Every structure is written in C-alpha cells, then in structure tokens.
Amino acid sequence: MHYARIILTLTLAFLALADPWPAAAEEEFVTALTGKFPPFSYYDNQGNLAGFDVDVSREIALRINRESRIIATEWDGILAGLLAEKYDAIIGSMAITPARQESVDFSTPYYHSGAQLFVHRDNPDKVYSISECNGLRIAVVLGETYQHFLEEKFPDVEVVTLKSAAEIFAMLEQKRITGFVTDRLVGAWQVKEAGRPFVPVGEMLYKERIGIPVRKDNPDLLGQINTALAAMEDDGTMQRIHQRYFGLGKTSSSKLGTMEPSVIATKLLKGFAVSLGIALAALLLGFVLAIPSGLLLTFQRGSLKPLHFLVRGFVDFIRGTPVLIQLLFVWLGLGLSPFPAAILTLGICAMAYMAEVIRAGLMSVDPGQDLGARALGLSPLDRFRFVVWPQAFRIAIPPLMNCVVALLKDTALVSIISIPELIREAQSIISVTFEPGLYYLIAGLMFFAVTFPLMKLSDRVERSIKAKGFAHD
C-alpha cells in the first residue's frame, strides 16, 4: 500500500502539472483552428502557427485589448469544444450554415469563397463537373460542409471522408479517388504550393460566407469581434492580410512544403514525450485502481458482494464501449482540460482490462496453496502477500504487459482533444510537407521502438520472479 500511495501521488502530480490548456485568463482571447488548413492555418518552416486565420485572430485580439492564445484542434470536434467553453471563438474558416446557427452565433463574414471540385490532371474518369461523378469516389475532409452538401444534393456520389488535405492528395495521386471537393481558394493554393498535378473542373458548386462562431451566451464578445472586423475592413488591414497570402504573385514567407529538419525532429520528439507521459500517468493510475478492482471481481462473498456487482458492471461498461467515446465524454461532459481528461480516461480504461487480468491470475492459483498457508497459521493478509499474489502476478505479467502496450498505442486517440502528442505533431508536419506515408511510418517506428522492448521485458521479469523463488513451474 505504501508503493500504491507513492504511485497515486505521482499520478496526481502529473495531472496537476502537465495540463497544456490552463484556464483562460480574462484578458486572453482564446481561439481555435486546425493548423492543418493552409494557407488559412498551418505550421511554418520553424514549426510556428501561421496563416490567414492566424493573422486575423491575432489582429482581433489586439483590437479588443486582449492577449491572443490560439489552440490547434481537430475539425470534427471543434464546435463541441466551443460549446464546452474550451475557447472563446473559432477563427478557422468556418462556413455560416443554418444548422450551425442553431447552436452558435456567427460574426459578420470576414471573407467569401466557395466549393470547388478538383481532379487529377490526367482525369482518367473524364469528369468535368460534379454531376458526372455518380458512382465515383469524391473525397472531402471529415466534418466540413462539403460532405453534407454532396450527400444531400448528389446521393449517387460515393463520398470519402479523410482527416486532412494531405491524405486526400495522397489518395488522388494514387488514383484511388476521382477527385476532391474543398474551398476554391484553399484548393488552388495547396495544389500550387505542394506541386501536385490536380486541376479544378466545372463551376463552383456553391458560394460560402465565412464567419467567426461564438457561444450564444456571449453576445458582448460577438459585438466586439464585429466591431473589430468592421474596423479592419475600413482601414485596409483585412485587405493587407489577404494580399499577404492570396495576392497576385505573392506567397507566404513560410512556403508550404518545407519545414526545417531540426524543427521536424523537435516536434516529433516532443510529441512522443507527451505520448509517453500520458501513457505512464494513465498506467500508474490504472494499476493502482486495478488491484482492488481485481480483488473485488474475484471475491463475491458476504459484505463484498454488492461491491463485486458494482465493479463488475463498471468494468464491463468500460470494456464494452469505445475509448474515443469515453474520452469525449470525460473531456466535454465533465469539463476537464485535455491532459487530465486523457489521463483519467486512459487510466480507467487500463484499469478495466488489468483488473480482469489480475482476476484471472488470482483464480488460476491452486486453492491448495491458500489452504496450506492457512494451516501454517498465516494471516489472510500474509497468505495473500507471500503465497497467492506472487504466483498470480507471475501468471498475469504477460497479459499485463500487453495492456501496457495497448495503452501506449491508445494515446494516439487523444489528438482529437487537442493534445500535441506524437500523431498530432506528425499530422501538423504532414499538413506542411504533404508526405503522410513518410511521417506516419516514422511515428509508427517510434512507437515500436518502445513497445517491442516492453514485450521482451515481460519475459525477463517473469524469469526474474521465478529465479528469486517467488513462484515456480
């Protein structure tokens, strides 16, 4: 129990110190975007956020006398984060739609664009408009309005949803899709800067007004944003920002497709350190909770029976529901910041699986071992500590190590709540370099470099326990 207290203390300390999203100070203007939508938001060759939306966000913060803080998060969860009060506004090229206006209020539009179909220059399917794409695969980024438009207006088109433009570009280069639909300005800019053989075809599918959503309970902030946008239009600031990224013959000073090797290495290593930190904290929390949970799953007599059924129901629920849903529930439903939400979710998930492993280990010990220890006059605690637990633990080591490996891999899920772990950092690099195969491979090898030794370590620990006489064949 002494070690358990130490482990739990370290876990709670990690929870307190590791949160990258401190509560917003009143003087801060906290905005969200994806960081994967160049030229509106992306990481430059030094690894810093840049782009049209980034500049607009900082300019608005300056004009409303607040300090700008920009959070990069996943697009498919960005509105949920706003409604959960994780940030003040979204300045991420969000189109104003009636469905979105039901849950948030939008500023006046700060630019106009439209949806455009792009295909490979070779155009093997010979399509020149979206109406000719029936039965063909057209890609969009998950969560964008183009997906709903195509599904509603062109139900015979097979809509393929992917996480980023880089993944779409890779699919189209391999000709696994016919084309993709995206913002006309964004698509043209990305294709040019990434040097891909894609061309727009047909007319714009529809026009879009792009605004800044805020929560409906924050009309004062909405008024300040609208005032700032109007002033930026009047004094030419908005036009200058637009020229910086879209002016004739102009490109961003941080050209897309390039990122310093040292910056790439730093981002990957920092992201992996975050992944390992989350995994370690969740493992410690999960193991501390798994031991008593495993005992309660094993013993169901007398006064322990109600607790047994309570723990059994909880463990079955955790094991029977997707980790991603649990993560979103803890983050949005409980209102926790990303790091505590990730550690708590993965820790409880690990507890559920490790508790079952411990239960199986305890039940595999020959009952005669406990009877023999009882005949020698050992107390129940001593029988457990010196006879039952060493044998059960040895049996449980290989599956427990599998739980550790699975937990480390599950950290890849936490990118959806804006934690800059390894996969999120790899995606930010891919959004600039458009080389998904290379950087996903590197990320996979980094995980393997840790998980493979862990699998071998389990064999060594098992042999060590046997050699010290804690267990036998």
Task: Give, region by region, the residue ranges found by the protein language model.
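Short helix-initiation/N-cap motifs at beta->coil->alpha
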Residues: F37, V54-D55, R69-A80, D125, ...
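Short glycine-rich His-centered loop
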Residues: E27-F52
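Acidic, polar ligand-binding/catalytic clefts
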Residues: V54, R58, L62-E132, G195-L205
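Periplasmic-binding protein-like
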Residues: T34-G35, R100, Y111-R121, R184, ...
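Extended ligand-binding regions for polar small-molecule ligands
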Residues: V54-I64, R121-P124, S131, L136-R137, ...
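Alpha-to-beta junction loops
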Residues: V30, R66-E67, A84-G92, L136-R137, ...
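Transmembrane alpha-helices and adjacent helix-loop boundaries
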Residues: L142, S254-D473
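Beta->alpha turn/N-cap motifs
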Residues: L33-F37, I71-D76, E85-T97, H120-R121, ...
